[in-house]
Amino acid sequence: MRLAEVVRNTSETQIRVKINLDGTGQQKLATGVPFLDHMLDQIARHGLFDLEIEAHGDLHIDDHHTVEDTGITLGQAVAKAIGDRKGIVRYGHSYVPLDEALSRVVIDFSGRPGLEFHVPFTRARIGTFDVDLSIEFFRGFVNHAGVTLHIDNLRGLNAHHQMETVFKAFGRALRMATELDERAAGQIPSTKGSL
């Protein structure tokens, strides 16, 4: 089993992430941001990752630091669980619909952080959650997991549906990319010999 636990403590947040990449989708989430917990649940369930996240942040100011630092810590945990990246598929992609919404996520465990985020949300907030924080979450993740990530919402009228399809597709693409390829066991999936 590929397991990792990462603790991140700053003056703004205290976050603990524990992940099992070879899990069954079990989750225990307590970030203090209910909508973020809902989205993290999508990652765990659709990625089949066992995921525990506990966060304490400066929510009296706003959700920004908690959301961003959760992305950072999750990225660190995924990178730690994968290790040297030998034998992983490396690339993953997924399309996910939800009623009128459709999103595509493509990921590459290249070792080169990069984010292309194209989601034209139809409103600025989902309940009390600022939709701009989703890009901060994913930026934190890519910078600390060392991945290239393309996120495109292809259509959607309901912002909740747009967001949910993005996180579901991300979980499924992440699962695909981190799976072990039996035919490439022990090999780095790159002609360079390293990632």
Curated annotation (Swiss-Prot):
Q: Give the chief site where it resides.
A: cytoplasm
Keywords assigned by UniProt, alphabetized: Amino-acid biosynthesis, Cytoplasm, Histidine biosynthesis, Lyase
Protein family membership? Belongs to the imidazoleglycerol-phosphate dehydratase family.
Query: What are its GO cellular component terms?
Result: cytoplasm
State any GO BP term from the record. L-histidine biosynthetic process
Annotated EC: 4.2.1.19
Where, per UniProt, does this protein localize?
Cytoplasm
In terms of Pfam families, this protein maps to:
IGPD
Q: In which pathway does it act?
A: Amino-acid biosynthesis; L-histidine biosynthesis; L-histidine from 5-phospho-alpha-D-ribose 1-diphosphate: step 6/9
Keyword Cytoplasm listed? The answer is yes
Q: Quickly give the catalysed reaction.
A: D-erythro-1-(imidazol-4-yl)glycerol 3-phosphate = 3-(imidazol-4-yl)-2-oxopropyl phosphate + H2O
Question: Is-annotated flag, keyword Metal-binding?
Answer: no
Regions annotated as coiled coil: none
Which molecular function terms from Gene Ontology are attached? imidazoleglycerol-phosphate dehydratase activity
What broad taxonomic lineage does this protein's source fall under? Answer: Bacteria, Pseudomonadati, Pseudomonadota, Betaproteobacteria, Burkholderiales
Please identify the protein, giving its name as recorded.
Imidazoleglycerol-phosphate dehydratase
